[in-house]
Structure formats: C-alpha cells, structure tokens
Amino acid sequence: MKRTSKFLSLLLALAMVCSLFVPAMAAEGEEGIVVLYTNDIHCTSDDGLAYAAIASYKAQMEDTYGADNVTLVDNGDAIQGGILGSMSNGSWIIDIMNAVGYDLAIPGNHEFDFKMDTFLDIVENQAEFPYLSCNFVDADGNAVLDPYKIISY
C-alpha cells in the first residue's frame, strides 16, 4: 500500500511539473487586454522609468493588443514630490499625464498636499481622464468623485 501511494504521489507530482511546460494560448479570435498602472511616481520625470518610458511602453502594448484593449491607470501620489510638482502645484505633472494618455487615476494622499481646492481644480478643469474614489466624500457624506468606471474591451 505504501509503495503504491508513493508511486501515485510521484506520478501526480510529475504530471504537475509537466503541466508547467504547456503554453497557455488565447482561443482563436480572442484578444488580450492590458492594464498598465503607475503608483507613487512622485513627479519622476527624468529617472529610468519616467513618463516618456511609460508612453513608449503603452504605445508598444497598443500596437500589440490594439489601442482599445490597453488601459493606463495611476494609483496615486503622482503630482507631489519633485520640482515639477512643487513649482506648479501639480499641474505640470497632469499636463504630462494627459500627453501620455492616462485613462483614469485614483487620488493618493499626496494629491491633497497642495490643498483641496487645487486638487479639485485639477480634476474638474485640467485632467483629461477621470479621477475615481469610492471613499472621498464631502462634509455631508456625498461622493466627491465617481466611485468607478466601466470599461468595455
């Protein structure tokens, strides 16, 4: 019994290892989707993975998967932490994010470093993409931003 059990265990382990070598392929006619995201960039504009690199990578993914199948998201803390953010209260970074082609963003705690009015002005008048948040409410408990966005691929 022990010998049979060991043999079956070994056979099962071998089958599991062999399954790692079978490539996963999309069904014919199906396209992949790509969700790219950034977070805690803190105004990075000249390091290795700066906005130019993000724009280039997004373009590569759009060439591969189609522009309608690629979504670029920022998960917060983009507009503060560097000279470009400090000199413009974050607005120059938003200009760069618009040029890169962000599809949506989530505010991080540092999006509020330049005061609430500044952030809301950026959201309402400058960003060409929506900011989303399900837990950002005003004094009366009303949502300030949309809580979600449905994207169809």
Give a label for each model feature.
Residues L11-S19:
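Bacterial N-terminal signal peptides
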Residues C18-E30:
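Sec-dependent signal peptide cleavage junction
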Residues M1-L11:
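Bacterial N-terminal signal peptides that target proteins for export
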Residues A27-Y153:
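Acidic, metal/ion-coordinating pockets
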